[in-house]
């Protein structure tokens, strides 16, 4: 295969020296593990390719483009005006790269939905120009949709080793094969088509987070990813301020910056600050200690592990994602776990309660998480009197009720619960206003696009940009699907592309729409009321009293009188309607009238409006 690649490179016009350079690069050695076409595509993408290399294939297109003054397009497909679903397109001529590919979690208006991913139809329409996915870090709101994307697009994915390890696990779970994951480190520079991308180390609540400095034909674009400025991080690798300053000196055309904490003044505390709280709780606790945290925050987990070891406690990991991610983090060297301190759940009985520390999922009150099941006595480890539970996270918007219920249940079981309103058990991974100001000062961007947040977050970040001296006409409050066109000396919003939400329900992708969600909401509110009407097939004559089936409306055994009245009303109504039925084979009008009549009856009797489902059963007798 290697020989074949060299031949193809020669035919495309590469010099012997250029081809030989690939022979001696680590990238080439890694790429040969991919399929031939994939390898060729990636190698071409990472090479600075002059127009002459493709003169044979693109001559007419290149001649046409020279007179059109090409613009760089920035197109967010998700992540604006919402939490999650982060995805941003950078497009110039024949090259498209996509930054992040995340999911959002369903809200209370989406019953039965597992997750929400961005609408990728624009990428499908332009698949031949898509070169790569560039991932800033491994949180679900940045990688959660990648398996669905790679089922459609056979392009490389670039990310740090921890990010790619999480993606690889996700792809394995979804049985997505024949992919090409390209590992990079902070400080690396790669070239994909016309884009030159440098990965810059940032601090965040997950290992391996990077910002992106993208050099394009019209100027430098900086995308911060999720970040905060932490000078004392757990891994002793602080944010690379020097690289941001270096790009500020070069001149930044546009900045896309994290808006999550743009409402909050001051600076986000260092992750290391939590060590003081953990030390205090571990010193005072007399029984077992259970810590619930995000599994992906290996820095938080490392602090808990270190504190437990100092206090002579063994450590047990519970919850599927906690077990999986800690194993990955340990294997990659991000997490130090003393072998003799980690035990399985079954062996905890061999230790006194004051020697036990359990790290579990469930900081958001998720119904299938370890902490939730422990609080509901649906787990081998049942929390009780004398236990101390630390919920080391703040509730994500929309999860407040779930978290509150778990806290209440833990108190009812006699546990001592330590959470964010009582102690400093959580710090954010996102920059506050003073850190955002620092980034404005360092980068001095000509144009600014606030990203990653609800509308209120974006608005406050845009306000801050104006305070920092950026021309208000150079600040773009965009919506998902907007197209921002950037030239070397110009910027304007110009149209939209398809965008929105694709709902995932089990194995179904995008087959749930607004009508289905509306019916599900109605079902969840007042239930289902079904009337089964038997009729003679040839004559349309009513053959008996309709049968009634309800779900989530009333408990039939306690509602005999209502059901009897409903059957009588349904029989009278069906009899009248059957007499008027002109076409015995078409019961559409009959069912619509039954539905309307039963709705009025039930509303008058119960003040409820269940989903009413008339069913006509034709009997040939």
Language-model region placement:
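Hard-cation-handling environments
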Residues: 264-392, 396-398, 402-421, 425, ...
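Polybasic, lysine-rich low-complexity intrinsically disordered segments
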Residues: 33, 61-62
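Low-complexity, intrinsically disordered or signal/transmembrane-proximal segments
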Residues: 11, 16, 21-24, 57
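His/Asp/Glu-rich metal-coordinating catalytic cores
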Residues: 64-134, 139-350, 369-382, 401-405
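C-terminal tails and terminal domains of large nucleic-acid-associated
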Residues: 585-620
């Amino acid at each position: 295969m290697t020989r074949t690649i060299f031949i193809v490179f020669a035919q495309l016009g590469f010099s012997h020296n250029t081809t030989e350079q690939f022979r001696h690069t680590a990238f080439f050695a890694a790429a040969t593990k991919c399929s031939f076409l994939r390898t060729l595509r990636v190698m071409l993408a990472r090479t600075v390719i002059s127009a002459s290399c493709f003169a044979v294939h693109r001559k007419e297109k290149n001649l046409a483009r020279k007179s059109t003054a090409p613009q760089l397009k920035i197109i967010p497909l998700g992540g604006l005006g919402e939490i999650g679903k982060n995805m941003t397109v950078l497009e110039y001529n024949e090259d498209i790269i996509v930054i992040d590919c995340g999911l959002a979690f369903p809200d209370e208006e989406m019953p039965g939905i597992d997750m929400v991913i961005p609408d990728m139809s624009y990428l499908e329409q332009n698949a031949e120009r898509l070169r790569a996915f560039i991932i800033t870090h491994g949180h679900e709101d940045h990688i959660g949709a990648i398996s669905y994307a790679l089922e459609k697009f056979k392009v490389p994915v670039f990310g740090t080793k921890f990010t790619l390890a999480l993606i690889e696990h996700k792809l394995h779970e979804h049985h997505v094969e024949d992919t090409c994951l390209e590992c990079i480190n902070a400080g690396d520079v790669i070239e994909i088509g016309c884009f030159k991308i440098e990965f810059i180390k940032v601090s965040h609540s997950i290992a391996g987070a990077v910002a992106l400095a993208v050099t394009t034909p019209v100027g430098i674009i900086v995308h911060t990813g999720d970040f905060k400025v932490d000078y004392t991080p757990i891994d002793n690798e602080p944010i690379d301020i020097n690289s941001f300053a270096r790009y500020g000196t070069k001149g930044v055309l546009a900045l896309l910056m994290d808006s999550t904490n743009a409402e909050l003044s001051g600076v986000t505390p260092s992750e290391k600050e939590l060590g003081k709280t953990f030390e205090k709780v571990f010193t005072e606790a007399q029984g077992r200690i259970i810590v619930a945290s995000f599994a992906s925050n290996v820095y938080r987990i490392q602090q808990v592990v270190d504190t437990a070891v100092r206090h002579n406690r063994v450590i047990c990991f519970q919850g599927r994602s906690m077990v999986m991610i800690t194993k990955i983090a340990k294997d990659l060297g991000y997490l130090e776990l003393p072998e003799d301190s980690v035990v399985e759940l079954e062996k905890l009985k061999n230790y006194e309660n004051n020697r036990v520390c359990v790290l579990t999922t469930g900081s958001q009150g998720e119904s299938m998480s370890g902490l939730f099941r422990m609080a509901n006595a649906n787990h081998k480890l049942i929390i009780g009197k004398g236990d101390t539970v630390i919920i080391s996270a703040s509730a994500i918007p929309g999860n407040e009720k779930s978290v509150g219920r778990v806290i209440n249940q833990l108190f009812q079981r006699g546990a001592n619960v330590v959470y964010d309103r009582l102690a400093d058990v959580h710090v954010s991974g996102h920059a506050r206003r003073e850190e955002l100001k620092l980034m404005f000062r360092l980068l001095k961007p000509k144009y600014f696009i606030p990203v990653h947040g609800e509308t209120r977050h974006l608005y406050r970040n845009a306000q801050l940009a104006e305070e920092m001296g950026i021309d208000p006409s150079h600040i773009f409050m965009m919506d998902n699907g907007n197209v921002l066109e950037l030239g070397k000396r110009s910027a304007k919003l110009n149209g939209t592309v398809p965008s929105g939400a694709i709902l995932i329900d089990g194995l179904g992708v995008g087959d749930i729409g607004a009508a289905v969600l509306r019916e599900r909401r109605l079902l969840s509110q007042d239930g289902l009321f079904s009337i089964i009407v038997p009729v003679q097939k040839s004559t349309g004559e009513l053959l008996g009293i309709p049968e009634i089936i309800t779900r989530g409306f009333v408990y039939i055994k306690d509602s005999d009188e209502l059901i009897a009245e409903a059957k009588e009303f349904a029989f009278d109504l069906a009899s009248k309607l059957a007499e008027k039925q002109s076409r015995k084979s078409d019961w559409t009008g009959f069912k619509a009238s039954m539905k309307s009549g039963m709705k009025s009856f039930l509303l008058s009797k119960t003040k409820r409006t269940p989903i009413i489902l008339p069913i006509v059963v034709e009997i040939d007798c």
